Amino acid sequence: MKRNKLRELLNEGKPTLGTHVITPWPGIVEVIGHSGAFDYIEYIGEYSAFSLEQLENFGRAIELFPNMSSMMKVEEQGRGHIATRSLDAGIQNVLFTDCRSAEDVRECIRFIRSETPEAGGVHGFSSRRISLGSNAVEWVKMMNDTVIAIMIEKKGAVEN
């Protein structure tokens, strides 16, 4: 199980430094990873085209760098599907956009957290690449360690 450096730094109360990319090309991940300058790389899926295969290759490239985590910026439409498939591909953290209410935020959290009584989520155990070689306990820990970021950008989100 790959360590989630972003989660570790946040848990320690330390600052983080990330960068954004608008392409899922693994070569970009490798260039950024070899720089050693960033704690995480955020793929801005909200504004670019990608396939599920490209997400998996992005996740594979991230695994080359134990000191760098990853994040997927997810748009409003289809966010549950995109977020869970990103995690299952190996992207460790998720940034949700366009939340308009506290209920929207709670829904985003449910998408990520495992479907256990303790976690209260709806994300079932994955039989995809990220969980291969992991057991259910490790997988639940991965989902609990996922940083769930919420972009507050809509008037309703500020008011609610």
What are these regions (language model features)?
Residues 1-160:
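Expand to "…catalyze enediolate/carbanion chemistry for C-C bond making/breaking, isomerization
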